[in-house]
Amino acid sequence: MLKFKYSDFIKAIFLLFISIGVFIISAGLFYEESYHYKKDDYFTHYALTLDEVKDIPVISDNYEFYYYSPDGTQRLTNGVVFYNPMPEHKAELVKYIETLGFKKTKSIPWSYGNINEVWIKGHDEVNLVQDDKNRTINISFIKQ
């Protein structure tokens, strides 16, 4: 006669609950189409931040990362907004962009009162925006 083992049943139920939990957590991670996060949010920082963004020189003590997922025609965008940086530190970001192999294609000084620079490498793009009015420097990497 067939013997039913309670321990095998409990193991199967436990494994089922663990699997459902992992699925819900991983699905929830990518549910949002945009994230704003700090470096100390380790899981989000590790999972969503591009290597180019992880290695950006820090030019201010106050900064936050952002991520926009590719959806439809929107491309993956990941970057950093630096609040109250010293304007002369922008040169560090320019040097970093150049070391990655990006070439400056245009500078738009009239873009809503900001200084907007666009850098291209292949199909990838970097936007560097200096907003003197709000005292921010925004660098974003846009991937194809």
Summary of predicted features, one role per range:
Residues 56-109:
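Mature extracytoplasmic domains of secretory-pathway proteins
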Residues 2-5, 86, 131:
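Alpha-helix initiation/capping motif
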